[in-house]
Amino acid sequence: MTYDVLSAIASPIIVALDYTNISKALAFVDLISPLYCRLKIGKIMFTRFGPELIIKLQQRGFDIFLDLKYHDIPNTVAGAVSAAADLGVWMISLHAIGGEKMMAAACNALSNFGLGVPKLIAVTVLTSLSDEDLQIIGIPSTASDFAIRLAILAKNCGLDGVVCSAQEAEHIKNICGHHFTIVTPGIRLATDELGDQCRIMTVHQAQQAGVNYMVIGRPITQATKPNCRLVEILNSLKITANSVALSSN
């Protein structure tokens, strides 16, 4: 079977890796192409395997979203962001709720990195949190309204974009501008189960909402032929910047 595919830069898919064994992680990664996605490394894998994992993935040609969601005093976050940039990652996350000074310090820490500077994005409200969850921790706002407020703060601090639910993406784009990057987790295919996230959308809904990057985990990592699944998703989104015949087998 052949598919029309795209250039590496055009893909909106970020595959979330979630493995406790580095050999299994690399075995999966060797089944997919960096032409079709980037990779997200979170707290569990980075804590287990450290920078060595990042290097191994970069050697295979993948751009890395280092999703450690930094949240600390400004100097500490600035130092952590600088250290992450030294690893050559493509994108770094921090928590917007850390506040204006923290986010400004993080931006300033990247000011001397030149053309290879990573994208710096702020997590707004975790997609696992509902309005009721926010009320319980003392935030008298809906998840959507709070996410929008944090996105505006992040933009004003100079960040490149935010991580948010697809439900807020369109509104945030309208307020913060077309060039403000939206990264959305909790993206599922139409036939998938919800998993542990309660504010989700399908890939097509996310595309229509203006999401720039869609974080997808188990629908790809648990697929029998993950590379074919990637191409199927990209074709369904009609992302064919460069038409190249890919033979899937």
From Swiss-Prot:
It is an enzyme of class 4 (lyase). GO terms for biological process: 'de novo' pyrimidine nucleobase biosynthetic process; 'de novo' UMP biosynthetic process. Belongs to the OMP decarboxylase family. Type 1 subfamily. GO terms for cellular component: cytosol. It comes from Baumannia cicadellinicola subsp. Homalodisca coagulata. NCBIfam families: PRK00230.1, pyrF. Pathway: Pyrimidine metabolism; UMP biosynthesis via de novo pathway; UMP from orotate: step 2/2. This is Orotidine 5'-phosphate decarboxylase. Substrate binds at residues 18, 40, 67-76, 127, 188, 197, 217-218. Disulfide bonds: none annotated. Pfam families: OMPdecase (PF00215). It catalyses: orotidine 5'-phosphate + H(+) = UMP + CO2. Keywords: Decarboxylase, Lyase, Pyrimidine biosynthesis. Gene3D superfamilies: Aldolase class I. CDD domains: OMP_decarboxylase_like. InterPro entries: Aldolase_TIM, OMPdecase, OMPdecase_AS, OMPdecase_bac, OMPdeCOase_dom, RibuloseP-bd_barrel.
